[in-house]
Amino acid sequence: MIKPIAVALTLLSVSAYADVNLSADVKAKIEAVGIDAFYAEKSPVEGIYSVFSKEGTSYVTSDGEYIFTGNLFKVKGAEVENTTDEFISKGMRSYIEKLDTITYKAPDEKYVIGVFTDITCGFCQKLHNDLQFYLEKGITIKYIAYSRAGMNSMVARNMASVWCADDKPAALTKAMKGDGLPDKQPTKACMDSVQNQFNAGNMFKLSGTPSGLSLKGEPMVFAGLRDPDQMLNSLKTANQKK
């Protein structure tokens, strides 16, 4: 029996199977062993589905009789390609679409990235300080709240107050600069919103902030700060692969 990873996930108010193309029988079988899937697609291996859930990534046979976890690699001559990373990116896209992100839209949008951020993170502050340069290169940024200190911290509460602001982009910019936080206390709805975003970071297996992924075009995952030119080059490279 597969036991779910102990992640406290507040479920979003959407159908659990909004993006899952599995038969009712297979859904029932994987639910019975604790896999609450919300995105699935055919894997590169015939007869096997890739399933993304709050428990992580699993692979399920088309009849639901066998389940395994881990990375699925494709052999390319002397090299191997981790197809699981690409699938995780797709699953995360599906999840992030339902989150309350703070968006800074590029005037001439070519790419969209989701960035897990913490208002106390120096590299996050650096990225935000250079925000205009990302936007000028056609990169729209959607910020996802991720308190490195956890949800039972003042940082999480402060970030919730930003997400509760009437003008969220302005409030986030002010917080990133250290110029203060919104006066009003965060509501439960705002705390829940930040909780959902924090859970997404745990599902993404964050090693630090800023980290994230492309939300438009071919999948691209990044960890750590990339300056505007590096980010643009990474996105271009990802979109030239196929």
Where are these regions (language model features)?
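Structural alpha/beta surface segment adjacent to cysteine/selenocysteine redox centers
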Residues: 111-119, 123-186, 202, 206-207, ...
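C-terminal low-complexity, charged extensions that often adopt amphipathic alpha-helices
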Residues: 83-94, 133-135
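Surface-exposed patches in mature extracellular/periplasmic domains of secreted proteins
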Residues: 38-43, 104, 143-146, 174-175, ...
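N-terminal cap/recognition module
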Residues: 63-79
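C-terminal cap of thioredoxin/glutaredoxin-like
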Residues: 19, 28-30, 37-38, 46-68, ...
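Sec-dependent signal peptide recognition
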Residues: 1-8
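N-terminal signal peptide c-region/cleavage motif recognized by signal peptidases
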Residues: 13-18
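A short beta-strand-turn-helix
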Residues: 93-110
